[in-house]
């Protein structure tokens, strides 16, 4: 949430010549309402199920490469973690500091989990999800102090090298 997955993902997809898909967009399209509305009207559990369905629909049976940006909480589900690990050749974790996440998400009304104390929530979510990110990621990019262009360059370099990158 706020690490730059969508922004970086779009640029990486363009550079690679692959389609870009954001799982939140798939959820909104299928649900016929925004992610915020899904959370508010149907609850987080329903959103997570829709998110899992979206990830599965993008990854399973795909014959051509795609750049997929998932929500930061996609890793909560062991099914998602397994699916992503099995179906994706490169899984990039954009590792951002909580301070950076607070600044980046401050202006967005589309982040229902951040209603209230955003800094405390982001710290808690980051701590809860850390082991799952480490489990799934094949590439870890530290985004601290980096521009979007530098993050994209680091991602492309890591993909080309085919190795872990920090």
Give residue ranges: language-model regions.
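The conserved Walker
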Residues: 1
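Walker A/P-loop
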Residues: 6
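NTP-dependent small-molecule kinase module
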Residues: 11, 15, 65, 90, ...
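ATP-dependent small-molecule kinase phosphotransfer cores
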Residues: 22-85, 123
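Short glycine-rich anion-binding loops that position phosphate/pyrophosphate groups of nucleotides
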Residues: 71-74, 97-99, 146
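A glycine- and Lys/Arg-enriched "phosphate-lid" helix/loop adjacent to the NTP-binding pocket
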Residues: 86-131
